[in-house]
Each structure stands twice: as C-alpha cells, then as structure tokens.
C-alpha cells in the first residue's frame, strides 16, 4: 500500500473511534498499525516515530478513466473537481499539528482548487505571531495545494475576510465557492464532496455543525433555549465552524469586509457576525450533522483531545466561561447594530421565513 492509502485508512479509523464504534479496541489497534506504516513503510524500524512527510496530491480520477466508464458517484466527483477554495487560519502554537489537518484536506474525494492558509507575523489574542522561518511552516509549504497568505492579524476573521477582500477587489466579481475549516480538525475523504453536492441541491450555506436559534416574543431567545441544527435549509440555523462550512461569495456584500465593527461587536465570535451578514442577505443554512454541536466526539475528530491542546483555543480562552452571557451579549449588540444600519433585525428575518 502507498503512504496515501495508510493516511486515508488512518483518518477513517479515527472517525469511527471518535463516534464510539462497537469495535473500538480493534480500531485503536488498526490506528496504531497505520501510524507505524506511515512512519516506516517496510515495518522494520525500531526507531521512535517521527512526523510523516506530506502526501502527494491525489490523482484525479478524470485523468485516468474516460467519463463514460465511471460510476455515477465517480462522475459526480469529476464534475465537482476543483470547484472551490479551502480557507483556514492558525496560530503559532497550532503549527506543529497542522500538517495532519492539511494532509486530510489533500485526501479528499474531490480536490479543491487550493488551500489558503492565512497567517500573521504580529501577535493578537492567543497568537504570538508566526515567523516566515518557522520550520513547521516550511514543512506545510511542501503540500502541493497550500498557498500561504500573510495578512493582518484579525484573529478568527482571517479564515474568511482576506478571501472576500480579494474577491471584491475585482472589477468584475464572479461567484466563487469556498469552505472554511478549523486548524485542529481531521476531515474525512467525503467532506468536500458532500458539502458541494448539498450546495448544488439547496443553494444555501452548508455546514456539518450548528445550532438552531429560537424566537421568544419576536426576539432571539437566550442561548440555552437554542436547539440543535436543522437538517434542512432554514434561516434559524447558525453554522459553527469546527466541522467546516461552505459559502458562495454572492452570499456576502462589500460591507462584510469592513472589520472595525465586527471586531468591536464580536471579536472572537466570527460565526455570529457571518450568520448576521448571510441571514440579512436572505441566505438560509443547512446543518448536515445536527448532533455534532452536542459533543466534540459527535463530529469530526480533532488532532489532539488532550486538555492542554484543546484548552489553547479561542472558544476555551474567551467564550467557554460564561459562554451563555457572552453569546447573548453579542446577539443583542448585533441585533441593535443591524437594526440601526438596515432597519431590520435578524429576528424579523427569521420570523418572516417561518411557515404561517
């Protein structure tokens, strides 16, 4: 087997283990074997494990077989090939593990056009800044689809705003699809394909994870009253980014990239700012795995479940403690902001979209 085969198997086993599969012991053994073969393909070395080098980009099935001979699923994959960009950001402390995330994105059924990594030299929030000479960064740049972008440090907004700024800078703007991902999550091979296929059916924001906002007295209710996401397009759905979200650039306006207000209202809650922008543009969202928001173990696996690693995140450091109060405060500020700016709140949009 090739290194890429072991990598794909490793990701599949990790997903099964995270989902609590009944054969957990055997799966854990298989994970160990895959990791050993990634490090030592011949299985002969007794040396301590070292980090595997990036796998080569998968060869598109369309280059090896005539379209007429492919299955329906394979024809769909060919048609979707290269139709979107993947966008993410990271901080200095996450770089040592990021190669695993990037490798999972290189093992997709449907390859993206490119994977944009937006990083910054200057510190902000948890990020101490990244040096261009960082050896982990140099390793990441060996991946064929990676494109490193040095940008101003706006925290979590870096995964979406630089891409939209570039898009809106064109004199003739075209519709572009892009997927935002997190820097600590391993994405299964069907990840991008499922997002794209769902988008083509429903023409809306598509997420694997999210919450459904609830109205009380014509206002957005307090966070504890919110439900799990709805698995159909709804204005009530608020996608949350960990397991990936697909957007079209036409879901946004140029106002979105003016970040002073966003950072003032929701400096670490980019999911809220994005929802308010898309919602007020009349764009619903669908959540494909509603229970993912109830536990990290119900969604895609992360690179490290240790308390030390998971604790070093914006959510844990800024949003987790008294998260309800912080979320509710951000919602109130956003509602007042958009009502003053546009004369309409998101609650009104949600209410109008509900069946009579």
Task: Locate each region found by the language model.
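Alpha-helical linker/edge segments of TPR/alpha-solenoid repeat scaffolds
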Residues: 32-51
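N-proximal low-complexity "stem/linker" segments adjacent to membrane-targeting elements
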Residues: 48-107
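C-terminal catalytic/acceptor-binding lobe
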Residues: 64-65, 77-82, 97, 101, ...
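Short, acidic, metal-binding catalytic loop of nucleotide-sugar glycosyltransferases
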Residues: 101-113, 121-124, 139
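Active-site-proximal specificity loops/subdomain of glycosyltransferases
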Residues: 120-175
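Short beta-strand-to-loop acidic/aromatic patch adjacent to the donor-nucleotide binding site
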Residues: 172-184
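Conserved catalytic core of nucleotide-sugar-dependent glycosyltransferases
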Residues: 186-261
């Amino acid at each position: 087997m090739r290194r890429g085969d072991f990598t794909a198997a490793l990701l599949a086993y990790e997903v099964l283990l995270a989902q609590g599969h009944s054969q957990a012991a055997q799966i854990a053994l298989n994970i160990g074997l895959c990791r050993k073969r990634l490090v030592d393909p011949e299985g002969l070395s007794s040396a301590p494990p070292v980090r595997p080098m990036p796998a080569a980009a998968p060869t598109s099935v369309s280059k090896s077989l005539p379209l007429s001979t492919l299955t329906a699923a394979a024809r769909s994959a060919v048609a979707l090939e290269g139709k979107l960009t993947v966008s993410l950001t990271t901080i200095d402390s996450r770089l040592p593990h990021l190669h695993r995330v990037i490798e999972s994105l290189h093992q997709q059924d449907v390859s993206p056009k490119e994977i944009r990594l937006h990083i910054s030299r200057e510190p902000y929030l948890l990020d101490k800044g990244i040096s261009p000479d960082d050896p982990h960064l140099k390793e990441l740049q060996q991946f064929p689809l990676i494109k490193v972008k040095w940008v101003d440090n706006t925290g979590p907004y870096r995964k979406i705003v630089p891409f939209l700024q570039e898009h809106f800078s064109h004199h003739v703007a075209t519709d572009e699809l892009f997927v935002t991902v997190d820097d600590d999550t391993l994405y299964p091979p069907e990840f991008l394909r499922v997002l794209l296929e769902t988008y083509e059916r429903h023409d809306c924001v598509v997420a694997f994870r999210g919450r459904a906002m609830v109205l009380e007295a014509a206002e957005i209710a307090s966070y504890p009253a919110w439900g799990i996401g709805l698995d159909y397009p709804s204005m009530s759905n608020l996608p949350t980014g960990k397991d990936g979200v697909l957007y079209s650039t036409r879901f946004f306006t140029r106002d979105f990239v003016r970040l002073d207000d966003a950072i003032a209202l929701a400096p670490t809650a980019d999911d809220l700012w994005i929802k308010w922008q898309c919602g007020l543009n009349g764009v619903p969202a669908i959540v494909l795995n509603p229970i993912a928001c109830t536990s990290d173990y119900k969604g895609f696996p992360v690179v490290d479940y240790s308390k030390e690693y998971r604790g070093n995140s914006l959510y844990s450091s800024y949003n987790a403690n008294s998260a309800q109060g912080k979320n509710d405060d951000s919602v109130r500020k956003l509602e007042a902001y958009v009502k003053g700016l546009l004369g309409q709140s998101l609650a009104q949009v949600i209410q109008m979209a509900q069946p009579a």
